[in-house]
Curated annotation (Swiss-Prot):
Taxonomic path: Eukaryota, Metazoa, Chordata, Craniata, Vertebrata
PANTHER family on file: OPSIN
Carbohydrate-modified residues: N25
MF GO annotations: G protein-coupled receptor activity; photoreceptor activity
Protein name: Pineal opsin
Originating species: Petromyzon marinus
Length: 444
């Protein structure tokens, strides 16, 4: 370690001493080795507070994201293409907490990064890598929702292979953005407070500046632009649909609720990553700036809190997932209540159905009035001419065909052969079974 201290830092090695900074009580911290002792000028209770905060965040995140993975693995109806990215988000957040959260908890208890240089590089890379995967998963989720609802490619439908390909691109692209510091383009080094490791924001070297600019562009500006574009197009689509059904209050309510949910998603993204991005740009632009180490630690803690509220916003607010989650709880009373509510929802839950017609096709966008649950397309069956619900983006399926509907289906087929148009259901209505839908479209 002495040799490490004496050797001059280079862009291929991790510097052993942090620059001097103003301490929490106004004193100036001298050059110190973050792998051997705590930063001078910071009271021990500050590290204890940070350890308690990280312990709480880590425990909540591990529990929530592990529950998401277990429930999705147990219930087949949740394993749909649009849900793949949600499971990927949970897995990335789980890894951030398991590695970054747990390491930060123990290092804050000690007051310094006692694990050594190589562990610092590994922790900095792993947390940054999995954090970027989670960040790009949010952008991919927004794009997939835009793709499913707005249908920019017409009848092209999102399938499992497309969802898996999108996730593979996210992981490979994130690796390409976070691996360079390990290979020599910039570096991972201890933070100013000395208990976590991160990209080298503080260097004035050109190669460090170029990496930070690349990282900022590809891991903040680009995904944020994808999120704004996708949700902007989605809201625009819903507003147009609402204008075509001006007399339907439920349609307007569904549109307003979806808009509010989108605003919450974007604000959550900005609250998580804007402090980190702002801090990185300020420190990179002014490497000689003196910041309080505790203040400099805030952006990193903000980014780690996303592992707690991401599952709440994107997963637990989904009614279908909540119902499945309750089924794995040990409390039998909750299971019975959930089963009753789920059965009753068939008759009480309303959707705002938006009809968009194209030659040879009719598509419906059903917005559940309680969550961002998009049911994909509702189109006439080629065999019967009957409007049947197809696989929804949330994973729900229409009820199986009923033999009692055979005469009506034959009547619908005859009407289709004669060129008689079959109306689509475009008004606000309760969710119907297959038999009820058929009886409404072609009454006997």
């Amino acid at each position: 370690m002495d040799a490490l201290q004496e050797s001059p830092p280079s862009h291929h090695s991790l510097p052993s001493a942090l620059p001097s900074a103003t301490g929490g009580n106004g004193t100036v911290a001298t050059m110190h080795n973050p792998f051997e002792r705590p930063l001078e000028g910071i009271a021990p209770w500050n590290f204890t507070m940070l350890a308690a905060l990280m312990g709480t965040i880590t425990a909540l995140s591990l529990g929530e994201n592990f529950a998401v993975i277990v429930v999705t693995a147990r219930f087949r109806q949740l394993r749909q293409p649009l849900n793949y990215v949600l499971v990927n988000l949970a897995a990335a957040d789980l890894l951030v907490s398991a590695i970054g959260g747990s390491v930060s908890f123990f290092t804050n208890i000690k007051g310094y990064f006692f694990l050594g240089v190589h562990a610092c590089v590994l922790e900095g890379f792993a947390v940054t890598y999995f954090g970027v995967v989670a960040l790009w998963s949010l952008a991919l989720l927004a794009f997939e929702r835009y793709f499913v609802i707005c249908r920019p490619l017409g009848n092209f439908r999102l399938q499992s292979k497309h969802a898996v390909l999108g996730l593979a691109v996210v992981w490979v692209f994130s690796l390409a953005c976070t691996l360079p510091p390990v290979l020599g383009w910039s570096s991972y080094r201890p933070s100013m407070i000395g208990t976590t490791c991160e990209p080298n924001w503080y260097s004035g070297e050109l190669h460090d500046h170029t990496f930070i600019l690349m990282f900022f562009s590809t891991c903040f500006i680009f995904p944020l632009a994808v999120i704004f574009f996708s949700y902007g197009k989605l809201i625009q689509k819903l507003k147009k649909a609402s204008e075509t059904q001006r007399g339907l209050e439920s349609t307007r309510r569904a549109e307003q609720q979806v808009t509010r949910m989108v605003v919450v998603m974007i604000l959550a993204f900005l609250v998580c990553w804007m402090p980190y991005a702002t801090f990185s740009i300020v420190v990179t632009a002014c490497p000689t700036i003196h910041l309080d180490p505790l203040l400099a630690a805030v952006p990193a803690f903000f980014s780690k809190t996303a592992t707690v509220y991401n599952p709440v916003i994107y997963i637990f607010m989904n009614k279908q997932f909540r119902d499945c989650f309750v089924q794995v709880l040990p409390c039998k009373g909750l299971k019975k209540v959930s089963a009753t509510q789920t059965a009753g929802a068939q008759d009480t839950e309303h959707t705002a159905s938006v009809n968009t017609q194209s030659p040879g096709n009719r598509h419906n966008i059903a917005l559940a009035a309680g969550s961002l649950r998009f049911t994909g397309a509702v189109a006439p069956s080629p065999a019967t001419g009957v409007v049947e619900p197809t696989m929804s983006a949330a994973g729900s399926m229409g009820a199986p065909p009923n033999k009692s509907t055979a005469p009506c289906q034959q009547q619908g087929q005859q009407q289709q052969q004669q060129g008689t148009p079959i109306p689509a259901i475009t008004h606000v209505q309760p969710l119907l079974t297959h038999s009820e839908s058929v009886s409404k479209i072609c009454p006997v």
